[in-house]
């Protein structure tokens, strides 16, 4: 029965594939964890936390996370411009899943 299901499955339409599409990429999970830990973070603070990320890559990741409604971007009308990022309520619900992934990774990491 399971073999038949797998043979006929469209994994791109599953919740699993959808969730992976939201968090795929080198930096998205780290960005989400920074926002969970520090709650409200500005662009340059994220850049400092991530160290090796370029402005373009960080900007792209933030736009994608915002489009997926995992984070909230708040822009303040002042000079110089001030923009802050926080986890959305939807993003907060994802963090429990990511925590479990991290726990599994720590418990099952292969050592040489």
Where are these regions (language model features)?
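Generic detection of well-ordered alpha-helical segments
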Residues: 25, 29, 63, 92, ...
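Alpha-helical linker/hinge and terminal dimerization helices associated
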Residues: 29, 68, 97-109
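Generic recognition of well-ordered alpha-helical segments
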Residues: 18, 48, 60, 96-99, ...
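Canonical helix-turn-helix DNA-binding module
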Residues: 47-73, 80
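Basic, amphipathic "hinge/linker" alpha-helix immediately C-terminal to the N-terminal HTH DNA-binding motif
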Residues: 77-100
